[in-house]
Amino acid sequence: MKNKYLKGTNANILLLGIVSFLNDLSSEMIMPILPMFIIALGGAGLIIGLIGGLRDSISSILKVFAGYWSDKSGKRKIFVSSGYLTSALFKLFLAFSKIWQHILIFASLERIGKGLRTAPRDAIIADCMPKERGKGFGIHRAMDTLGAVIGSIIVFLLFWFFGFSFKSIIFMAAILALLSLIPLYFVKEEKRKPQDINLKIGLKNLPRPLRLFILVSSVFALANFSYMFFVLRAQEFFTGRLSVGIPIFLYTLFNIFYAMFAIPFGKLSDKIGRKKVIIFGYLLFSLTSLGFAFFNSLTSFMVLFAFYGIVYAMIDGNQRAYVSDLSSEELRGTALGTFHTAMGLAALPASLIAGFLWQINPSITFIYGATISIISVILFIVFRNYFKE
């Protein structure tokens, strides 16, 4: 397994993978309990949508600027380091929340760190393995998600067997986030010349195929509302300790399947083309959303959360790799930042719409997601002549 997938992998990708492993170990101790923490402090469906949407949008608005600044300055590591540190600090503040408004503030501001680090980090990954970007992003995402798997297992154990409170778990997660900064010190950044560009020129110079792909993926982002609704959907059908334990278990299952398939689908996209893999991912998301709308047994939830993990394995790293394929090296940080920002700007209305529909009928939320996902596939087909394999 090691020889097959990691042979020839750049050291920076492995180091960044370790950083992401530790950071996601921290984050995924928080994420499966976050929607239930919000409910416990008085939040409701629309509040879940607001917090989920703001978290994605705040981080993504910063991504285009961080990507542009990293291109312009010729430096990427400083943004990556600042981002991980910022996230760790606001996770610590989150542990002391007493009302849902505190969660709204701290959970949203924690995403500033993600906004600072993501595009520059992805640009480093893209530059390290130019001929095998799908593999490079797949390896990074797999290590990231392995941390997520272990983190969600830990939170399940802490809650189910040791009776830890939500706040205690979040505090422990914040300490782990601070530890994730250690491997980052050893990442070696290649010297790059500062680019004489401004943000307007950088965006204008993005090629048309890239702009069209960002449009298509933004439509899909309108369907891909916050994971918290999937967790709450599972919680609806259980009571007592099971109403917390089962959603955490299912979220762990999601991460296991994500980790298992991230590298294989990255390598597959290197061979058959990213467009095909991404389209199949969109289609599977649509089917999965319909499943959440109409099935509610534990067995069906296990299958659906597994599919949900496979969807992310198909689209997450491959969308980033495809953006890198469609952009020039000089503007890669700007291109990735623009992509992430578009995703985040779509995330806020997506989650707000999902929250509004949830208050009418939770099933409608998932029917909405399935419908918009199909529209994104149709757009992919309409613009197919602009996209290279």
Model regions: which residues?
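Helix-loop junctions at membrane interfaces in 12-TM secondary transporters
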Residues: 10, 93-106, 293-304
